[in-house]
Each structure stands twice: as structure tokens, then as C-alpha cells.
């Protein structure tokens, strides 16, 4: 399991709204690191998911081991329509790659993302640290 963040503001040095934070390794590392993130920026969820699935597919090809993309989101600012997103996910997602989504808060959910995910859970109150940890830990496959 690896961890990226997204919704990063774009600048001269940040040309995409996402970046890796935790290299592939134990799921517990993801569960711990995600607790350090804040919220903000524009949630470029769809482009970030496509990039992460492509990266996970590369990881599977290199390692021969399955990979899981865990998305923790508060919502989606659509940067591609449903048909383009579905096609991009299909093209980026290789064999052995799973997608787990945890939606935090009461913001509008991305119905297309929910359809494409292998697992999808919601934590209504993002200030509930116990519920957050439980959902994210389960999504990451940590024990």
C-alpha cells in the first residue's frame, strides 16, 4: 500500500494536483500517515485516481504483488465527465489493482467513483477520529 495526497494547489513547481507521500509498503504506514493530513484545496479526485491507479498498475508489474489504492476524500470537483472518467479508470487500472474509498463528511459523493470502487465507506463526522481510523484502516487492509 502507498499513499498520495491530492487537492494540492498548482504552482510553477506543482503542475499536477497530487503527489506521493508514503512509498509502497505496509498498510499500517498509510493508516498512520493519513492522520496527519488536513483538508483544503480543490479536490481533483478523478485525475488523481486515474494517476494513482496507473502508478499502482506499474507497481504490480514491477513487484508481481497486488496493489491497493486507498482514496480518502471529502468530495469531487469534476475535472472529467463520467464517461471519460470510467474509460480512463478502465485503461489505467491493471490486473491486481484494487480501489478502496473512504468519504469523509457530508459533501456530495461522486456516484461514478462509488461504482468503480471495490469498497466504499462513509464517515459522516470527520471530527470522529475513531471512526476515521477504523474506516481508513479497513480500506487500507491493515489489521
Residue ranges and their predicted role:
Residues 26-33:
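Short, basic/glycine-rich phosphate-binding loops at helix/coil junctions
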Residues 17-19, 33-42, 74-79, 100, ...:
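Second-shell loop/turn segments in exported
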Residues 75-127, 131-139:
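VWA/integrin I-like adhesion module and closely mimicked acidic/polar interface patches used
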Residues 1-22, 49-52, 68-72, 101-108:
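Von Willebrand factor
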Residues 55-59, 135-142:
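C-terminal alpha-helix
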Residues 41-49:
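Phosphate/oxyanion-binding active-site loops and adjacent basic polyanion-contact surfaces
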Residues 54-65, 79-81, 90-91:
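Surface-exposed acidic, glycine-flexible loop patches that form ligand/cofactor-binding
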Residues 1-3, 22-26, 82, 86:
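…and closely analogous acidic/polar surface helices at protein-protein or active-site interfaces
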